[in-house]
Regions:
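Structured catalytic core of nucleotide-sugar glycosyltransferases
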Residues: 1-126, 161, 165, 178-182, ...
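Hydrophobic transmembrane-helix microenvironments that flank and shape a buried ionizable site
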Residues: 5-8, 153, 213
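Short, flexible, basic/aromatic active-site loop/helix in glycosyltransferases
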Residues: 101, 108-157, 161-164, 215-219
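Hydrophobic helical membrane-anchoring modules
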Residues: 138, 145, 169-238
Length: 238
């Protein structure tokens, strides 16, 4: 479980407790919080929780490097084959994690399944944020053909080895489905709950994501055009 956070002091304790409750008894797990240069009490509150939650590991960036780099730091440090991520603001529901794990174990899934992407079918956000996200997802899906209705959802389950093979750049977490498919992996979307933010303030706005998102979109499209996946024919004599 990798959780990137920045200045989420009021969300740390309730979310850690929810994650531990959701995963207790289901599987062996660790919770890795990556503090991306917080300037509030986030780090202190995480450290205070380690005595109660021995599975909690805390990594800190001295200065903020962005959400994608925080996720990469956590995935690199992880000790398990499969990684779950969720946002540290409390809007993703940890109770959905067992459902993702169940889908991973479903024998009907494709053999090359590498990513299960959460899909916030009913978002608890402002109208402007929902509208901008719907437009962005539509444009991205049309350009990248990633067949994923919601790439911005922080709740994902993916293979650690696959993630570490992907091109790494700022905001790459929003393009994981396209990048995984570029490497030949299958992606499956799973409906998940989305909750209203109860504490703290969002680090993202419509305007500070727009132009960066456009540049990144064309960059990922360029990467896709540079890859041709072979169709392997089995030698009938062997």
């Amino acid at each position: 479980m990798v959780v990137p956070v920045k200045n989420e002091q009021d969300n740390v304790e309730p979310l850690v407790r929810e994650i531990a409750t959701a995963l207790s008894g289901n599987t062996t797990f660790e919770i890795i919080y990556v503090d991306d240069g917080s300037t509030d009490a986030t780090q202190a509150r995480l450290q205070a929780l380690k005595a109660e939650f021995p599975m909690l590991r805390v990594i800190r960036h001295r200065t903020s490097c962005g959400q994608s780099r925080a996720v990469t730091t956590g995935v690199t440090a992880a000790r398990h084959e499969w990684i779950t991520t969720l946002d540290g603001d409390g809007q993703n529901d940890p109770a959905d994690i067992p459902a993702l794990l169940a889908e991973l174990a479903n024998p009907a899934q494709p053999d090359n399944l590498e990513l299960l992407a959460g899909w916030r079918a009913r978002r608890n956000d402002t109208f402007l944020r929902r509208l901008s996200s719907k437009i962005a997802n539509g444009v991205r899906s049309r350009m990248l053909k990633d067949n994923t209705p919601d790439t911005g959802c922080g709740l994902k389950l993916f293979a650690r080895e696959t993630f570490l093979q992907l091109p790494n750049f700022d905001h790459m977490h929003r393009f994981l489905p396209a990048l995984v498919m570029r490497n030949g992996g299958a992606v499956v979307s799973v409906p998940v709950h989305h909750r209203a933010r109860e504490r703290g303030t969002s680090k993202y706005g419509v305007h500070n994501r727009l132009w960066v998102g456009i540049v990144d979109l064309f960059g990922v499209a360029w990467l896709q055009r540079r890859v041709r996946l072979p169709v392997i024919e089995v030698d009938s004599d062997r």
